Amino acid sequence: MASGVMVSDDVIKVFNDMKVRHQLSPEEAKKRKKAVVFCLSEDKKMIILEPGKEILQGDVGCNVDDPYKAFVKMLPRNDCRYALYDALYETKETKKEDLVFVFWAPEEASLKSKMIYASSKDAIKKRFPGIKHEWQTNTFEDINDPCNLAEKLGGSTVISLEGKTLKS
């Protein structure tokens, strides 16, 4: 079921900037987004950037010690959101960096919110070509555990996320 919700040009630009990993100057690299949260506009007709809900690569190691935990803290407890998270992880063979599309639909969200976000998900996914990993999660218990994200990224072959060794 399509909701008729549109995706703002700003959302598409952020996706394209996060997806393309070309050679950046050190200053440009610091401004690259590590994580960003999207929400519906007040009139529920447009998917937009949620103001103030982003982590820049330059924040990591400075005022953000654990980017994954900081990302989780940006999500509301009682409403749905979409997000992009640029995951840096290591498998038994190599280090990797992949974008993950997250659909956050907490159990505490209203039924109306869950329905409109679920029916609008395809609108945003169609504007994000090439995303390898999609994760729908419904509880803070699930999203708080980085092992659950690691499972989406490669299962038992993932040994660390954001430089932190995962528990087996």
Curated annotation (Swiss-Prot):
Q: Which UniProt keywords apply?
A: Acetylation, Actin-binding, Cytoplasm, Cytoskeleton, Membrane, Nucleus, Phosphoprotein
Q: Which residues carry this modification: N-acetylalanine?
A: A2
Cellular compartment(s): Nucleus matrix; Cytoplasm, Cytoskeleton; Cytoplasm, Cell cortex; Membrane
Any Pfam family:
Cofilin_ADF
Organism's domain of life?
A: Eukaryota
Q: Which modifications occur after translation, per UniProt?
A: Inactive when phosphorylated. Phosphorylation levels vary during development. Dephosphorylated by pdxp.
For this record, the Gene Ontology CC terms, alphabetical, are:
actin cytoskeleton; cell cortex; cytoplasm; membrane; midbody; nuclear matrix
**UniProt motif Nuclear localization signal: location:** 30-34
Any idea where the ADF-H domain is? 4-153
**Example GO biological process term?**
actin filament depolymerization
For this UniProt entry, the molecular function terms from Gene Ontology, in alphabetical order, are: actin filament binding
- Zinc recorded as keyword: no
What role does this protein play?
May play a role in the regulation of cell morphology and cytoskeletal organization. Binds to F-actin and exhibits pH-sensitive F-actin depolymerizing activity. Required for formation of the cleavage furrow during cytokinesis.
Family according to the record: Belongs to the actin-binding proteins ADF family.
Q: Which PANTHER family match?
A: COFILIN-RELATED (PTHR11913)
- Report what the protein is called: Cofilin-1
Which organism is this entry from? Xenopus tropicalis (Western clawed frog)
